[in-house]
Amino acid sequence: MTSFSTSAFRPVAFSLGLLLVMPAAFPAPVTLGEDSKEVAAPNRQLLTSTERIDKHIWYILDGISALRKEICNKSNMCESSKEALAENNLNLPKMAEKDGCFQSGFNEETCLLKITTGLLEFEVYLEYLQNRFESSKEQAGAVQMSTKGLIQSLQRKAKNLSAIATPDPATNASLLTKLQAQDQWLQGVTTHLILRSFKEFLQCSLRALRQM
């Protein structure tokens, strides 16, 4: 299995609590002690929930960009034709008109459910990436853990948590096994497609969340 170095993306030691109160100086990390001091500063304006989520998504996007850069530098996947990439039959989450996230027909609650559900569906693919970046698991793990924190933030905004569909663990386990059994070339294509699709999903989510 080919591994990719991700030295360009320096990992941070995440805890879910820290992720949910990420400071304004993004993406530079701070310790919990430093964060407490900044919040206590007399002239410091606290970030709203929407602003924290906005910065949280940008942080993940920065990590994805660094990982994609490493892949593009070490393989020709980024230059492969769309036809070749399309041969990989992945069912990656994506936005559609019915999801209520586009300007036309925007629906806040429907869109929020789609974003949260989509991120939950991406988790199995992010787990797959942990095995693709064996020499630098911490870097890929930073994106994975930060995404978990983002999901929790969005779940707190949802009015109807029961409407958020959770992927079946057995189905995810089967999918992960199938992805890991691909030949080396297909695994490279899969890695590229996951990062590209996740980036596009987050960008669309970012635009929609700014309207909420």
From Swiss-Prot:
List membrane-spanning regions. Answer: none
Q: Please indicate if the UniProt record lists Plastid as a keyword.
A: no
One cellular component term from this protein's GO annotations in UniProt: extracellular space
Q: Which gene encodes it?
A: IL6
Q: Where does the UniProt annotation locate this protein?
A: Secreted
Q: Which sequence ranges form a coiled-coil region, renumbered to this chain? A: none
Name of the protein:
Interleukin-6
Give the principal location in a single coarse category: secreted
Lineage summary: Eukaryota, Metazoa, Chordata, Craniata, Vertebrata
